[in-house]
Curated annotation (Swiss-Prot):
<feature type="region of interest" description="Disordered">
    <location>
        <begin position="418"/>
        <end position="442"/>
    </location>
</feature>
<feature type="domain" description="BRCT 1">
    <location>
        <begin position="1"/>
        <end position="93"/>
    </location>
</feature>
<protein>
    <recommendedName>
        <fullName>Microcephalin</fullName>
    </recommendedName>
</protein>
<dbReference type="InterPro" id="IPR001357">
    <property type="entry name" value="BRCT_dom"/>
</dbReference>
<feature type="modified residue" description="Phosphoserine">
    <location>
        <position position="279"/>
    </location>
</feature>
<feature type="modified residue" description="Phosphothreonine">
    <location>
        <position position="335"/>
    </location>
</feature>
<feature type="modified residue" description="Phosphoserine">
    <location>
        <position position="287"/>
    </location>
</feature>
<dbReference type="GO" id="GO:0005813">
    <property type="term" value="C:centrosome"/>
</dbReference>
<feature type="region of interest" description="Disordered">
    <location>
        <begin position="184"/>
        <end position="206"/>
    </location>
</feature>
<dbReference type="Pfam" id="PF12258">
    <property type="entry name" value="Microcephalin"/>
</dbReference>
<feature type="modified residue" description="Phosphoserine">
    <location>
        <position position="333"/>
    </location>
</feature>
<dbReference type="GO" id="GO:0000278">
    <property type="term" value="P:mitotic cell cycle"/>
</dbReference>
<dbReference type="InterPro" id="IPR036420">
    <property type="entry name" value="BRCT_dom_sf"/>
</dbReference>
<feature type="region of interest" description="Disordered">
    <location>
        <begin position="557"/>
        <end position="582"/>
    </location>
</feature>
<keyword id="KW-0597">Phosphoprotein</keyword>
<keyword id="KW-0677">Repeat</keyword>
<dbReference type="InterPro" id="IPR029504">
    <property type="entry name" value="Microcephalin_mammal"/>
</dbReference>
Length: 835
């Protein structure tokens, strides 16, 4: 260690690199400590010397204010080498930021990593306070613990060593006993457990028959497996999963003893009148007794309704048939089938009530119609679509009872169940629409996507925009619809008021007209389209546009099946034939609404009904003209992409990145150009930041482009549009630019210069600079001819190492570049390469 030559010095070191990213204070701090000086980490009143270099302005000002000696790092080095305390005035510190304005604050960011010191209570005051607080809290918890509370001991890995289970169980039981005693004193209702319920059912089976399923379903509701199953669980899922298995085994003994047919039949009749909710969520969460009291109130209301002659033999018949439907639907196991009477109240989905109504409707309908309906249900892809085909007769009969019950049970319904979707939609409708006058009106349902596609394929869309006619779409025959019914003569003529120009809008109008129509046969779909091909008063069928099908798909936006060649046919028979599964056809009736005068003027071949005379109307070539006009913009859009991209490109050269970013932003704002890295066939403008002769400038001159300065972009941005280029053309530096540009504008076809047209064949050396490809392109653009081999050429451009001929000129690359710049062939004598 050196001698303590600076023992009276208390120094504060602030030494940074000139760019303010590196802090070198630590090195000089070590040297000062070695020489016996004290180094302060902060600038306090004890500091006598400040070693300063490129430090903070505040440190400089503070040192000058206090009169502390400001020295440079050279003073420290001189003291170390001389081994003595050198005079500070010989090495004053310099402040480079002193003359800079005070508004500019120089940011400092040291790139050296900090020394990481692990926090301990000894070296960190905040950590020490937190540690002391935790120790006090732990001591307080230890003193407040009772003797009977067990103390749990843990190993280092976190596993439990000692757990006094006897004390835990005893304290748990004592707490339970206290709670039970309190509830008895307050006379609160105690919910019986499952074992107590089974014991009560053995003692009094007739009374507990309705109570046990309620509590069982509540236990099932509270089980984890039920909640994991979701809300859309069916009866099989709820009663067949693992969550109900324990309850099923517990109940087997008691259920086998319960064989009272009277009670089961009464409960089935009760379930017939009560619209049960689709899940167990209708149970009251307070206690089963409260729900039983609510149920008893509903039974009283039901008995009053029964006394008022609301229940009819039709309902009894519906009850029996609904029970059979329920058994067939869910295939109950032998154990559960014995208790289906009372589980029917709690777990039957709401759709079963709709099915009951459908079956009761079937009992009143003729056998033939019922067989058709069953056959169509079996054939249907989605049988649930048929649920809405019930009659309004049962709703008329049991209307008051259903209204009274629906008000009481609405809070228990699973509102988001898919079975309730159609009932929710029907609740929003007025009562007149909920009670239809006849069952046939239910066939006027909304069309599926497949049916819509088939209608589009078989429709004549050339009829858009010329002449109005009315099309009545009768009963459609497809897989999801039952066999076609006989069409009547009194078909509805409800015509939509909107004249459409697209098939989708026409179909929407068709649906609206179908809803407004009240015809007995349900032939209510009509929409108005316009047809140029048919004369006034012509009755014919719609034929598919086979020739222009692809155009039709582009215009309408269809993304589905291709045309299968199917055409719409009109049936002569009273009933339509069954359609094949692979090609669904639709019976379309096209009737024109004409006045009596027009009907008198019709030729004989066109008179009569379509049904009696199924003539075929072939689409002529000129009938597609209107439709082709409609889809022409779509074809052009498809060919050219979503939008037209700019055909002109702009190239930047000799331009720094800041200016390039400005140009890119201006081009994005004003549009009309796309940026290209090099000059190509589509380039029209070359922007040069500096008037330097670059390859892009020469290629731009050779192609007849505008060679402009950077100011053109700035002025265009100022005025908000691309302005005239001529004032900003660099014609002074590149005289050939305006000449080539004028020639390019005057040329009829693709522009090619004539500068080297009279010159002999040239060969460009592979060692030339600029590269061979660029030089060859320049010569070609200026009308010259380039050979791939040197023996065919009379001029060789660039350094050539082969055998030289006396008849061949060996010229420098500058000859080509200067000739293009000046737009004249320069004298070759000035560019000859040494032999």
């Amino acid at each position: 260690m050196a001698a303590p030559i600076l023992k009276d010095v208390v120094a504060y070191v602030e030494v940074w690199s000139s760019n303010g990213t590196e802090n070198y204070s630590k090195t000089f701090t070590t040297q000062l400590v070695d020489m016996g000086a004290k180094v302060s980490k902060t600038f306090n009143k004890q500091v006598t010397h400040v070693i300063f270099k490129d430090g903070y302005q505040s440190t400089w000002d503070k040192a000058q204010k206090r009169g502390v000696k400001l020295v440079s790092v050279l003073w420290v080095e001189k003291c170390r080498t001389a081994g003595a305390h050198i005079d500070e005035s010989l090495f004053p510190a310099a402040n480079t930021n002193e003359h800079l304005p005070s508004l500019i604050k120089k940011k400092r960011k040291c790139m050296q990593p900090k020394d990481f010191n692990f926090k301990t209570p000894e070296n960190d005051k905040r950590f020490q306070k937190k540690f002391e607080k935790m120790a006090k809290e732990l001591q307080r918890q230890k003193t407040s613990l009772d003797d009977d509370v067990p103390i749990l001991l843990f190993e280092s890995n976190g596993s439990l060593i000692y757990t006094p289970t006897i004390e835990i169980n005893s304290s748990h039981h004592s707490a339970m006993e206290k709670r039970l005693q309190e509830m008895k004193e307050k006379r609160e209702n105690l919910s019986p457990t499952s074992s107590q319920l089974i014991q009560q059912s053995h003692d009094n089976p007739s009374n507990s028959l309705c109570e046990a399923p309620l509590n069982i379903s509540r236990d099932t509701l509270c089980s984890d497996e039920y909640f994991a199953g979701g809300l859309h669980s069916s009866f099989d899922d709820l009663c067949g999963n693992s969550g109900c298995g324990n309850q099923e085994r517990k109940l087997e003994g008691s259920i086998n003893d319960i064989k009272s047919d009277v009670c089961i039949s009464s409960l089935v009749s009760k379930a017939n009148n009560i619209h049960s909710s689709p899940s167990f969520t209708h149970l009251d969460k307070s206690s089963p007794q409260k729900f039983l009291s609510n149920l008893s109130k509903e039974e009283i209301n039901l008995q009053r309704n029964i006394a008022g002659k609301i229940v009819t033999p039709d309902q009894k018949q519906a009850a029996g048939m609904s029970q059979e439907t329920f058994e067939e639907k869910y295939r109950l196991s032998p154990t559960l089938s014995s208790i289906k009477g009372h589980l029917l109240i709690h777990s039957r989905p709401r759709s079963s009530s709709v099915k009951r109504k459908r079956v009761s409707h079937g009992s009143h309908s003729p056998p033939k119609e019922k067989c058709k309906r069953k056959r169509s249900i079996r054939r249907s892809i989605m049988p649930r679509l048929q649920l809405c085909r019930s009659e309004g007769r049962l709703q008329h009969v049991a209307g008051p009872a259903l209204k009274a019950l629906s008000c009481g049970e609405s809070s228990y319904d699973d509102y988001f169940s898919p079975d309730n979707l159609k009932e929710r939609n029907s609740e929003n409708l007025p009562p007149e629409s909920q009670l239809p006058s006849s069952p046939a009106q239910f066939s006027c349902r909304s069309l599926s996507k497949k049916e819509r596609t088939s209608i589009f394929e078989m429709s004549d869309f050339s009829c858009v925009g010329k002449k109005t006619r009315t099309v009545d779409i009768t009963n459609f025959t497809a897989k999801t619809i039952s066999s076609p019914q006989k069409t009547g003569n009194g078909e509805g003529r409800a015509t939509s008021s909107c004249v459409t120009s697209a098939p989708e809008e026409a179909l929407r109008c068709c649906r609206q007209a179908g809803k407004e129509d009240g015809c007995p046969e349900g032939n209510g779909f009509s929409y108005t389209i316009e047809d140029p091909a048919l004369p006034k008063g012509h009755d014919g069928d719609l034929t598919a546009l086979e020739g222009s099908l692809e155009e039709m798909k582009e215009a309408v936006g269809l993304k589905s099946t291709q045309n299968r060649g199917t055409t719409s046919k009109i049936s002569n028979s009273s009933e339509g034939e069954a359609q094949s599964e692979h090609e669904p056809c639709f019976i379309v009736d096209c009737n024109m609404e004409t006045s009596t005068e027009e009907k008198e003027n019709l030729p004989g071949g066109y008179s009569g009904s379509v049904k009696n005379r199924p003539t075929r109307h072939d689409v002529l070539d000129d009938s597609c003209d209107g439709f082709k006009d409609l889809i022409k913009p779509h074809e052009e859009m498809k060919k050219s992409g979503r939008g037209k991209k700019p055909t002109r490109t702009l190239v930047m050269t000799s331009m720094p990145s800041e200016k390039q970013n400005v140009v890119i932003q201006v081009v994005d704002k004003l549009k009309g150009f796309s940026i290209a890295p090099d000059v190509c066939e589509t380039t029209t403008h070359v922007l040069s930041g500096k008037p330097l002769r670059t390859l892009n400038v020469l290629l731009g001159i050779a192609r007849g482009c505008w060679v402009l300065s950077y100011d053109w972009v700035l002025w265009s941005l100022e005025l908000g549009h691309w302005i005239s280029e001529e004032p900003f053309e660099l014609s002074h530096h590149f005289p050939a630019a305006p000449l080539c540009r004028s020639e390019c504008h005057l040329s009829a076809g693709p522009y090619r210069g004539t500068l080297f047209a009279d010159q002999p064949v040239m060969f460009v050396s592979p060692a030339s600079s600029p590269p061979v490809a660029k030089l060859c392109e320049l010569v070609h653009l200026c009308g010259g001819r380039v050979s791939q081999v040197p023996r065919q050429a009379s001029i060789v451009i660039g350094p050539y190492s082969g055998k030289k001929k006396a008849t061949v000129k060996y010229l420098s690359e500058k000859w080509v570049l200067d000739s293009i710049t000046q737009h004249k062939v320069c004298a070759s004598e000035n560019y000859l390469l040494s032999q």
